[in-house]
Amino acid sequence: MADSVEGSVAKLRFDISMSLDGYVAGPDQSIDEPLGVGGRQLHEWAYGLSTWRASHGQEGGKTGVDNAAVRESLENIGATIMGRGMFGPGHGAWGEEPWEGWWGGEPPFGTPVFVLTHHPRETLVKGKTSFEFVTDGIHPALERASEAAGGADVAQQYLAAGLVDEMQIHLIPVFLGGGARLFDGAGLEGIGLERRRVVDSPTGVVHLHFRTAGERGR
């Protein structure tokens, strides 16, 4: 989930890769398998792209429609919202040596990141990225992200609450057979969507871009 800026208006959009059977992570997520069993397949299409590599401090890489989709995903982002499951493994209290993210000393975000959790924790700064841990719900997290801008359950909550402006789904030609579904549960019925764009890639990935119908209420 990211708060992007267009002109002077902050917009909330989510961008995610999804399997043909609707999963955004494989089963049995763990420290050894942070994306779940088979979940890495959802993101392999992006790893060799020039925009992805540049965001991780690397040179070279491929261009084309997939790269354009990643570039659009990363443009004009002022802040990011994620669930605890995207930040790291486990639940409950953080412990004496709390997890500091999957990304090492230089996370690729370069902007404030707001992590939804039930357990308080001091703000963590890694490189150019700050992680603030929000314990009072999705609306306060959105307010903080919007001010700063000037995972599946999180996307569902914001979408069901009518707070999402746009979404881009990268449909990957694989079946995972289990894991975390993007759209799972009640509360999404009746949400209007306007198709903005559908882009077919030679790699087999289909990039779907939608706007939600109507004005978002804060």
Features from the language model and the residues they span:
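Enzymes that bind and transform nitrogen-containing heteroaromatic metabolites
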Residues: 2-218
